A protein has these predicted regions:
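Extended recognition/assembly regions associated with phosphoester-bond processing machinery
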Residues: 1-224
Length: 224
């Protein structure tokens, strides 16, 4: 019995150390975000007036942290940032053409690449804690780029590859144990109080939002 108690206490201590470390990391991250707002020192343009059009931008399966180095294709954090920059410029062009004043950004999951299989782990650029911060920084720049011309609303759901645990869960409690939610909340907290950038909702598996009388359903591909 004494051996069993010792093993149980050891397991509890190890679990408690991990939980305390994660809690401390979260507190420190929140404190830093509160100190350094994403719009600090940036003069945001006035929210556009008039214009009836609204653009919907879908961000899905960005798979930040994946590294591809093939003759026919390359992908890493730098290329991902360049592609989002190009997308923002295209959105601005369309917005000017249609007289849009608002952009709704629908984040449909899998911001980060999986690391559950050996080939995925070997092809990733860094660990997923660091990758989540890099991803948030790239998405911050993307949203600020769009904010130069539009009012912004952001919605989000989880994907399947960005989940923290190996098992795929469907309940809200399990499905939101995801780097997708973490990145969304980092952005939400960093942009808190920013004029013209609103984070309007995040759900585990599906989400509905309305634009100009039309209802949009957000789903990730593994549910279709």
């Amino acid at each position: 019995q004494a051996d069993i108690n010792r093993i149980e206490r050891k397991a509890f201590r190890e679990h408690a150390r991990i939980e305390n470390a994660v809690a401390a990391y979260t507190r420190e991250l929140c404190a830093r975000l509160d100190e350094q707002q994403f719009t600090k020192g940036i003069q945001l343009t006035p929210i556009p007036e008039g214009g009836d059009s609204v653009l919907v931008v879908q961000l899905s399966d960005l798979h930040f942290n994946e590294q591809v180095n093939l003759p026919s294709n390359q992908y890493n954090f730098t290329i991902a940032a360049q592609r989002l920059r190009k997308l923002a410029q295209r959105v601005k062009q369309l917005g000017a053409s249609y007289g849009a004043r608002k952009v709704v950004v629908a984040c449909l999951g899998d911001f980060l690449n999986s690391d559950r299989r050996l080939d995925e782990l070997l092809s990733n650029c860094t660990n997923r804690s660091q990758a989540s911060l890099l991803a948030a920084d790239i998405l911050r720049a993307f949203l600020l780029d769009l904010r130069e011309q539009f009012e912004i609303e952001v919605y989000g759901i989880t994907g399947n590859e960005s989940r923290v645990n190996k098992e795929l869960g469907w309940s809200d409690e399990l499905a939101t144990d995801s780097y997708d939610l973490m990145i969304y909340e980092i952005l939400k907290r960093g942009f808190a109080g920013a004029d013209g950038i609103a984070f309007c909702g995040f759900r585990a598996n599906e989400l509905l939002f309305e634009v100009m009388g039309r209802t949009f359903l957000c789903l990730h591909g593994h549910q279709i």
